[in-house]
Amino acid sequence: MFGTLHTNSAQGTVNRIIDAFPGNLQDQIRTQLASTLIGVVAQTLLPRIGGGRCASYEVLVVTPGVSNLIRENKTFRINSAMQTGAKFGMQLMDDALFEHWKAERVSVEDALSKAHRPDDLAKRIVKARRGEDDDPIPVPEDE
């Protein structure tokens, strides 16, 4: 099944689905969602340098580990799982924004305006401009 929600992150989408139900049903919903959800894609559009628009995506693939996080009400750890889940096709929005900036598709200002953690993205961009390692800054588990 496909659905759309107005959220700006994969983690936010999972939380919004669960929060749509009364508190007394949320444990059951978490269990059902953990066993049925396959993935979440969050997207945003940015102005492209030179005209037009550029789509940036956050991708969550529901692996057994992510499924456990949903079931155990530990959705605050989803971003950490996504950061280490590139081999499964996962991508955080800020990583996508960084790649668009690096490829000179979007401006720094536009990338930072859509970033979930703009301070960390700004630090990463500064490091990349200096020619330093551009590895993502680890996501705190409380986000």
PLM region descriptions:
Residues 1-143:
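Short, flexible helix-loop junctions that flank or precede catalytic/ligand sites
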